[in-house]
Amino acid sequence: MKKSAPCTFTSINHQIHYAMSFIGGGVEVISFIFLFKALIGFMTSNLIFGINTFANGKFDYISLYHIGIVVIWMLIAAIHQLCMIKFTNFRKRTPWHGYAISLTINCFLLASFILIGQYMLTSGVLGSLPTPSITPLIIIGLMFMYIQNYLIKSGGTNYPTTTSVVTTVYVLMTTSLVNYLNHNISKSERQASLREGLHYLLVLIHFSAGAYITAKLSSHFGFYSLFLMLFILIAVTMNTWFTHSRFLCSSSDENSNDKAI
């Protein structure tokens, strides 16, 4: 009897991807609602906002706000690359070591984003227009989203996407699902297309669900509505560290057996 293939979507790599998509949807909608339509994970939208403002002849902080977000994002990317070069000899003890470290950093960043954001919201710092005083909050949010996108890009799901939801994801999902109907290819290729299409569909569902739930909660709790996302992130982080530890233990047991022989 032929064994059925294990469900691809239950691997820890996919769990991280879907959790990051859900959390990313929540953070994006909060930034859109409270940070003057700044989508801190989508640089193209900020670039368009900035260009449109400049085209209308406005050259104040408001016009620089969205362009500044793009510039800060590029600086974060540059710093990350410099760190990669500096610590090129860093050896990951397991395949999940880097993910666990990145997720842990993001726990602190998200907690800081929530607390500082709620303080600014209740104290009146977040007024009707953006001011330089909100820059620290923007930087924290951008750092969080950069790591989130990095986790999705390098999360090991073998599907070509760099963020939770970009235009490419919609195209890849649709073409993969439609390709399943192509009987000119083998059954295994059709199944692979179906799995890929369902993966992208799950990414979109998780992102949309996170954004919808957070948008509903935000009218009552403000930035505190992201505590749901923080709890999920902590759970995913702990699970990743546990997986890392189990892998280490199994590796050490194998080494002990080899030495005993």
What are these language model-derived features?
Residues 2-261:
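Alpha-helical transmembrane segments of multi-pass membrane proteins
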